[in-house]
Amino acid sequence: MRHDHLLSAKQLSRGDIEGVLDRAAEIAADPDAVAEKHSDKLLGLLFFEPSTRTKMSFDTAMKRLGGDTVDMGSVDSSSVKKGESLADTVRVIEGYTDAIVLRHPSEGSPKLASEFVDVPVINAGDGAGQHPTQTLLDMYTIRENAGLDDLTIGIMGDLKYGRTVHSLAHALTNFDVSQHFISPESLQLPRSVRYDLHESGAQVREHTDIESVLETLDVLYVTRIQRERFPDENEYRQVAGEYRIDADLLESAKDDLTVMHPLPRVSEIAADVDETEHATYFKQAHNGVPVRMALLDEML
């Protein structure tokens, strides 16, 4: 993959995706081979929203490549609290680091940041927009379990505000898959994403219940309801807990169904699913390290 920045899954071709996944598999098999490869590099971590997995896996990935990270820390302890603009912040951080990983509550912020710096900018989530590096590790996990073609994939939950969903849906258009979107009507895919999928010729179906499609699925990607994105708390309460997967429900699924979740989960996957062979979400999270190592290896 040869891009100056990674801002959206829409910029990734099939070749880009497979290249990163192949490199990640090589690194996972022999991490010592790259243990000092980027010992002269520093990665800037600018997270304007909370993060556990994404931030820690980028930190781990950079250090396992021999480099180090510079963390802006809490927004409350930075000059952002004093009113500093995003443009000024990234122009300063550019002078300290060789690449910037940015998470921000406003859609389009990584693209804006990329216009002010010459180092690579990697989108680690921009509001309800995109999360392309999550998609790469999702694709890696799907490929490990089921391949990437001739699949029926269900994506369930908050499709309106879920940025991981938007990125994954775009990336899957590069492959021979049928996508089924399961959500309340109020949380269906945004019109812009639907338009992109239609223009790509993707096989897409929308549902309001999981039971009608579960037995056909090879992969079920579950997401939480994005409470922090709702403009009205009452709107959130109307849909919270409406879609839930448990072991009893999965009795009607294929034996080899892969159940995924970008995490954190709230109540949308019951704890009893953890003990089934379907559960893949913790391994999915762990895959973030080799995938982000591969991405950094190609972009630095």
Curated annotation (Swiss-Prot):
L-aspartate binds at K82, R163, R224. Pathway: Pyrimidine metabolism; UMP biosynthesis via de novo pathway; (S)-dihydroorotate from bicarbonate: step 2/3. It comes from the Archaea. One of its GO terms (molecular function) is aspartate carbamoyltransferase activity. Carbamoyl phosphate binds at R53, T54, R103, H131, Q134, L263, P264. Coiled coil: none annotated. Pfam families: OTCace, OTCace_N. Catalyzes the condensation of carbamoyl phosphate and aspartate to form carbamoyl aspartate and inorganic phosphate, the committed step in the de novo pyrimidine nucleotide biosynthesis pathway. One of its GO terms (biological process) is amino acid metabolic process. This is Aspartate carbamoyltransferase catalytic subunit. Its EC number is 2.1.3.2. The keyword Glycoprotein does not apply. It comes from Natronomonas pharaonis (strain ATCC 35678 / DSM 2160 / CIP 103997 / JCM 8858 / NBRC 14720 / NCIMB 2260 / Gabara). It catalyses: carbamoyl phosphate + L-aspartate = N-carbamoyl-L-aspartate + phosphate + H(+). Belongs to the aspartate/ornithine carbamoyltransferase superfamily. ATCase family. NCBIfam families: asp_carb_tr, PRK00856.1. The keyword Transferase applies. HAMAP family: Asp_carb_tr (MF_00001). Keywords: Pyrimidine biosynthesis, Transferase. Heterooligomer of catalytic and regulatory chains.
